[in-house]
């Protein structure tokens, strides 16, 4: 269960971050449109700020928890969610899950939590979760800061080739997915067949763990989900005014090149910042990048919480 799965991922962190991540989160459940959504939580009622961690394709809350734990020293109330198809969330119709449902779920979760808790909320999105965090902030207006390891815009012609194993030119990949969708959209295939799970980390052992984890990279996704992502039109960055955005992109990412995310970020007219995590792969665990990530998170959480630190 991913309530303990974070321990396996924490083993790949250098100290002191490995020890920091051993604090046990607890499981919470939320009913949403006939689904039981699972979350990991470290509740700190007296904390001045909240953080919600959002995984991407092939991830889950346990995989992200060691990254979330980087902020636990900073007196933060932390949650990581399992989106449908991943983790322990109970999905009644796996073949029908589409990217837009992920956006809707997260927006409603943010609104539901905000109605009961008015502390500032920071969204931390990893991989595909970066664009989810961005879109949720744009749609809800209830987010103090967006932190993303990746901002891969499917409208960018280079994005599908970076996302998938299919080295098809330009928009050929999306056209193929649209052609397949009416008859094969519900067909579920292992995510590692479609995406570069082998490039998840610079450490082959960590990449192998991610690719075979039945709660994450070892799960199956419907082809229609991938089609729904490449066809999804996010809020144009030129129109984004919801919150400051910090891109914390691994500098040595072999899966999604940093320049794709940077050129999206630079179209945002408001406050934005790029922090390149030196020596880090797509799943950042290496020094000195992990220390750079921890430092960026400390500064963002302190500012969002109004502590002035």
List each language-model region with its residue ranges:
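An N-terminal hydrophobic leader/cap segment in hydrolases
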Residues: 1-31, 35-42
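Short alpha-helix in the alpha/beta-hydrolase fold that links the catalytic acid
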Residues: 243, 257-266
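Catalytic active-site module of serine/aspartate enzymes centered on a nucleophile-bearing elbow/loop
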Residues: 271-309
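The serine-hydrolase catalytic nucleophile loop
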Residues: 57-69
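Alpha/beta-hydrolase-fold enzymes
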Residues: 131-215
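Active-site glycine-rich loops that stabilize anionic/oxyanionic intermediates
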Residues: 56-60, 127, 251
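Conserved alpha/beta-hydrolase
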Residues: 68-92
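Short beta-strand/loop motif that positions the catalytic acidic residue
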Residues: 241, 247-249, 253
């Amino acid at each position: 269960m991913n309530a303990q799965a974070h321990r396996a991922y924490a083993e790949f962190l250098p100290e002191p971050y490995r020890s920091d991540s051993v604090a046990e989160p607890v499981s919470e459940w939320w009913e949403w449109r006939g689904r039981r959504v699972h979350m990991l939580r470290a509740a700190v009622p007296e904390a001045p700020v909240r953080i919600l961690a959002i995984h991407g394709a092939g991830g889950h809350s346990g995989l992200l928890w060691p990254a979330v734990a980087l902020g636990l020293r900073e007196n933060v109330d932390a949650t990581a969610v399992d989106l449908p198809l991943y983790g322990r969330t109970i999905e009644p119709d796996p073949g029908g899950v589409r990217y837009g449902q992920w956006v809707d779920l997260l927006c409603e979760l943010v609104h539901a939590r905000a109605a009961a808790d008015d502390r500032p909320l920071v969204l931390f999105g990893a991989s595909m979760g970066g664009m989810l965090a961005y879109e949720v902030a744009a749609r809800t207006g209830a987010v103090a800061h967006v932190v993303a390891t990746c901002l891969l815009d499917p409208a960018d012609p280079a994005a599908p080739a970076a996302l998938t194993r299919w080295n098809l030119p330009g928009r050929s990949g999306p056209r193929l997915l649209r052609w397949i969708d009416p008859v094969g959209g519900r067909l579920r295939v292992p995510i590692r067949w479609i995406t570069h799970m082998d490039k998840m980390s610079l450490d082959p052992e960590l990449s192998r763990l991610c690719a075979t984890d039945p709660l994450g990279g070892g799960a199956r996704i419907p082809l229609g989900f991938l089609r729904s992502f490449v066809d999804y039109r996010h809020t144009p960055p030129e129109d984004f005014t919801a919150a400051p955005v910090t891109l914390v992109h691994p500098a040595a990412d072999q899966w999604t090149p940093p320049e794709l995310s940077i050129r999206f970020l630079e179209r945002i007219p408001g406050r934005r910042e790029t922090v390149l995590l030196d020596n880090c792969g797509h799943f950042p665990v290496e020094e000195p990048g992990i220390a750079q990530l921890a430092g960026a998170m400390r500064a963002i959480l302190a500012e969002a919480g109004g502590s002035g630190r």
